[in-house]
Amino acid sequence: MIDKYSSNLVPVNIEDEMKVSYLDYAMSVIVSRAIPDVRDGLKPVHRRIIYSMYEAGNHASKPYRKSARIVGDVMGKYHPHGDSAIYDSLVRMAQDFSLRLPLVDGQGNFGSMDGDAAAAMRYTESRMAKVAHKLVEDIDKGTVSFNINYDGSEEEPSVLPAMFPNLLVNGSGGIAVGMATNIPPHNLGEIIDACCLYIDNHDIEILDLLEVVKGPDFPTGSMILGISGIRSAYLTGRGSIIMRGKAEIENVGNSRQAIIITEIPYMVNKARLVEKIAEMVKEKRIEGISDLRDESNKNGIRIFIELKKDVVAEVVLNQIYACTQLQTNFGVIMLALKDGLPKVMNLKEVIAAFVSFREVVITNRTIYLLNKARDRAHILLGLTIAISNIDEIIYIIKASNDTNLAKQELMARQWEVLDILPLIKLVDDKVILNERGTLSFTEVQAKAILEMKLQRLTAMEKEKLEQDLKHLATDIAEYLNILASRTRLLEILKEELIKVKEEFASPRLTSIEFGEFDQDIEDLIQREEMVVTVTLGGYIKRVPLSSYRSQKRGGKGRSGLSMRDEDITTQVFVGSTHTPMLFFSNIGKVYSLKLYKLPLSNPQGKGRPMVNILSLQENEHITNIMPLPENQDEWDHLNIMFATAKGNIRRSDLLDFKKIQSNGKIAIRLDEDDKLIDVKPCKEDEHILLATKAGKALRFPVESLRIIKSRISDGVRGMKLAKEDSVISMTVLKGINSTKEDRDAYLTVPWEKRLEIAKGEEFNLEELGVNLNADSILEMANSEEFILTVTENGFGKRSSAYGYRITDRGGSGIINMDINDKTGLVVGVMPVKMDDELMLITNSGKLIRCKLESVRITGRNTSGVILFKLDDDEKVVSVSLIAETSESEEASELAEEGLENDVKV
């Protein structure tokens, strides 16, 4: 047997054969299956479905037809593959959640966003969508080339004469051999506007196109985060776009909130999304959810997520974004067939390819219409000549034995045409006139004359023929103008695009959140002022500032904390939900957290242990919390100043603490008998004021300390302390340029007058009785700061910062407050403004706000006035300031704004 066929066997190298065969297979998949054409944006199967429906008359204006019949026609005529592959493609073109402009109008079950399969093709019905007609319009006018089908029995178009850039409008996706494409859908109006810009200026920059093409427009809506991925995709053809579903937060009563998801990212399975959320809740990767329901219906998506009491909805939503496909990436690969070859193109290249294709289509259509008009004019000229010579025409026909003889006689005769010569020139007919101004009928003209009805012999019909010739002449002139002028051709192209836009464009569904985003949820967190409270037992909470009512000095306050196990409050400050915080622990480590991540509570709540919020080690607890400016650009000019109870200080660069892992980092080395009192951001031109519990204070410039890079250093001596005394606060003050003598002279001016000067009121220099010029007084008044000192027994006073002389670090300091048994030890020292409010908190959990305008301004060496009436064994343990924004006490509870805590910015 082998010998019998040996003469027909050709030995080949198997390696070479594998290369050739695999390459042929790869190109077949690329060109004939998986990659769309840049011109009409369709793969072969989609193109064949639309053309088959068009050929079968299954138009948008006609009744629906069974999908099985359509699939059968496509498979039998053009696409010899499995019926399921054809039907799946038809179904996708009918899904309004898959295509931005569905090309098939389906009736029946065509699947859902839950991943449900469409009903069998014998149950569903389909027809062309109205917009699909714009893909095949003018296909019968020689606009595109046709190829024979797989068995040579039919012809199919190699491409559809699409009137809009379907590749960009509906997108495409496919995996070929060694390459893949993934093009997102866009808004029709924006894409057509970009095409018009390109038509007007072929040298337009891609960034200029981005002015109208904002980004993809997904049929499922949702939102796009950031523009870097969009810019990369449009500039290079590749990019990653972050998609995020849309959600709303609603109050559902009983202090509970619910997250309502109304839009999900493109191509995300809704049922799987709900299952994933439930799975994450079960695994405790998402906490705080009490109920989860899919309430979606025909009116839209609604995923209802009810939260537990006092849970921060924004934090839960952030966890959902991070753990599920509610936020996902769309990897853009703008790969399409151009000139039969796969190519990754940028936005301008895709638009240019489409516009170039439409130029060819319009040119081919114009040539077709020109030829048709000329053919028609040629016949009408023959009819016009015949009517002008009707008697002779009738005589010839009557004298002829048959039609062929009559036709030959008509063609053999020379006919006078001088009277219609203007019409011949008007339509630019290519007839040949002899020297006598006569011509012969062509076979086409003679045949038309023989087929002419007798009613055409009337004078009115002759006039109508002449009018038709004039109209044809106008059309022919326009066609010739289009072919001769590219400018006119582009005008027509632009006009047709605008008509498509006017008919089918719709508002954008996908919103774009400009700016760069990470996995954080900060931009969804409502900005609100919060009171942060820390207890001795390591509990922390945040309470809305509006929960506390403003009270006058001397009021009894309200219960600010329900005491359990005699826990007392050790620190309180006011900040925004967006305030970044550094947490310093007893072992000298530092942790980082945003304020909104703290547990939300009420004034009577205890909060949560910080050990459950931060990754603390055994026997480690937080001793100090430092709020920072929200704008990190300001961090470049800030340092961190550490102060310990033993009087040590250290100046470090704030940028050293910008990136802190969740498990923290070493901040400062502490001796066993020392503790961290305070940490504050500061600038080089500012001053540091250290204050002790015994009423001493020391002021020195920040610049007198060098920046210590080592985080394990315990710093240098800042203040020399007496026995049993310790530093209780550190304040950052403005730097001053005036001399001590000038400051002392200025302080002789009554404080009421100094405040008036600072407000801009005029003053009489002679009445002040000081040896200073007006400019110096005005400058010092505008720069004056006041230091508030509060004692544990509720006494307080305000003193001018000018009264604290500047010395070198390491000294014993000066008297800050005259303390005694009545006043008790000092618990808080800080700079204040005239319209600030003071917040005090006691060891019993009481909290009171009072306006500082009622606190007396005195010298340093005084005992102050009573700020807070205390019960027996009750002590003030923490002090903070609130910037007041409302004149009335009643409004202050409803409209609190501003923050003036320990942060200097």
Curated annotation (Swiss-Prot):
**Keywords from the named record:** ATP-binding, Cytoplasm, DNA-binding, Isomerase, Nucleotide-binding, Topoisomerase
Molecular function terms from GO: ATP binding; DNA binding; DNA negative supercoiling activity
Give any single GO term for biological process. Answer: DNA topological change
Cellular location(s): Cytoplasm
The UniProt record lists the Topo IIA-type catalytic domain at 35-524
Which residue ranges does the UniProt annotation give for the motif GyrA-box? 551-557
Q: Which Pfam families match?
A: DNA_gyraseA_C, DNA_topoisoIV
* Entry EC number(s): 5.6.2.2
InterPro entries (UniProt xref): GyrA (IPR005743), GyrA/parC_rep (IPR006691), Gyrase/topoIV_suA_C (IPR035516), Topo_IIA-like_dom_sf (IPR013760), Topo_IIA_A/C_ab (IPR013758), Topo_IIA_A_a_sf (IPR013757), Topo_IIA_dom_A (IPR002205), Type_II_DNA_Topoisomerases (IPR050220)
**Could you tell me what reaction this enzyme catalyses?**
ATP-dependent breakage, passage and rejoining of double-stranded DNA
The question of whether DNA-binding is a record keyword is answered with yes
Q: Which domain of life is it from?
A: Bacteria
Q: What does this protein do?
A: A type II topoisomerase that negatively supercoils closed circular double-stranded (ds) DNA in an ATP-dependent manner to modulate DNA topology and maintain chromosomes in an underwound state. Negative supercoiling favors strand separation, and DNA replication, transcription, recombination and repair, all of which involve strand separation. Also able to catalyze the interconversion of other topological isomers of dsDNA rings, including catenanes and knotted rings. Type II topoisomerases break and join 2 DNA strands simultaneously in an ATP-dependent manner.
PANTHER family, alphabetically? Answer: DNA GYRASE SUBUNIT A, CHLOROPLASTIC_MITOCHONDRIAL, DNA GYRASE/TOPOISOMERASE SUBUNIT A
* Quaternary structure (record): Heterotetramer, composed of two GyrA and two GyrB chains. In the heterotetramer, GyrA contains the active site tyrosine that forms a transient covalent intermediate with DNA, while GyrB binds cofactors and catalyzes ATP hydrolysis.
Similarity remark: Belongs to the type II topoisomerase GyrA/ParC subunit family.
Q: What is this protein called?
A: DNA gyrase subunit A
